[in-house]
Amino acid sequence: MSRRTLPPVRILGIGAFGVAVLLSIVGVPVTAAQGTTVFAVRTDGSLPVDAPFDAAWDGARPTEVVLSGQAVVPPRLLVPSVPVVRVRSLVNDDQIAILLEWDDATRDESVLAVDSFSDAAAIQFALGNGTSICMGQQAGGLNIWHWKADWAADLAGRRDIEDVHPAMPDDRHFPVNQGGQGPGPDGFLTGQMAGNPRSAALRTSSVEDLNAVGFGTLTPQTPDGQNVSGASEYRAGVWRVVMSRRLSNGDPNDTVLRAGSAATVIAVAAWDGSRGDRNGQKSVSIWLALSLPQKPMGLLDMWPFLLMLVLALVLSGLVMLYGSRQPAVGLGGPSSRPDWGGGE
């Protein structure tokens, strides 16, 4: 009697199941959210882009997105610091706003100490078909909106090392020019003079607009291309962050957002500064779909259909008029048989 052997497909299935069970036992999430769609809600008037807790957001149903730890490249994160992010979106004729909400026991908005890291969140948009979710690729890049809690705190006034160590002596101090032009000819602040966005003397937004085409290629857009706004608020252990942008801006480095078009492919990520999250150490989702509703049609938009309806009615009327002028056949009218004479 021959021995039965398992087919390769079944062996792989059993192996995958065993790995899943093992990861579940040690507390590592096996998958992130699958096949999730975020439905933007159309609203009339302005969007609450500066008010994360505005009542208008209650009209947008939150989509719960499960995150996994980024475990592809170092610094890795096996267990996500932020397990779930709730995503909502509102849109009008000109603008889109996306709200990210997640639970966080601490409010981390300073990076001035060596061992302090900021809370953060990001939304990435695929710029091509088949784009890798891991920072994109040359054949299909990413447009990334990156909100940083420390940048949000700097909007009220840029903080510096003196805020952490106010009595620290120094040999020579070059004060930062709050006009954003650098410290002047006698100063030497390399980051600011090189135009590093992280060293900027002034913050105009808490969100950085970036692009990437693979690992190690994350690049901020030029100052003129920074067109994403941000607003955030921390309440009772919950972060709410709103990122917004005009739907159409003509920037080739930005994602194209068009109401009623095919769903836009996005992903989200979150960082918990109190747990040392920074750079690649983050909680991430898989690809999601962002669906923007079709713009309601007005009378001007409906003119082709109205024209077709009028033409159809005119043609129907002409057909009926033509038919009414034809002699009736077989309905009691004069006989069409010839008179041969001599008939009965």
How would you name each of these model-derived features?
Residues T5-P7, G27-D58, A113-R203, G250-E344:
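Acidic/polar low-complexity flexible segments
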Residues G15-I25:
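Bacterial N-terminal signal peptides
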Residues P48-P52, A56-G59, A71-P74, V79-R86:
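Early extracytoplasmic/domain-onset interaction patches
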Residues A51, Q95-D104, W239-R245:
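Short, well-ordered beta-strand segments enriched in hydrophobic/aromatic residues
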Residues P75-A105, S110-V114:
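Long, well-ordered hydrophobic secondary-structure segments characteristic of membrane-embedded
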Residues V91, W102-D104, L127-N129, R245-L247, ...:
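A mature extracytoplasmic/lumenal domain signature
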Residues T190-G225:
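Surface-exposed, low-complexity/disordered Ser/Thr/Gly/Pro/Asn-rich loops and linkers
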Residues F215-N253:
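Extended serine/threonine-enriched, polar tracts that run as long, contiguous segments within proteins
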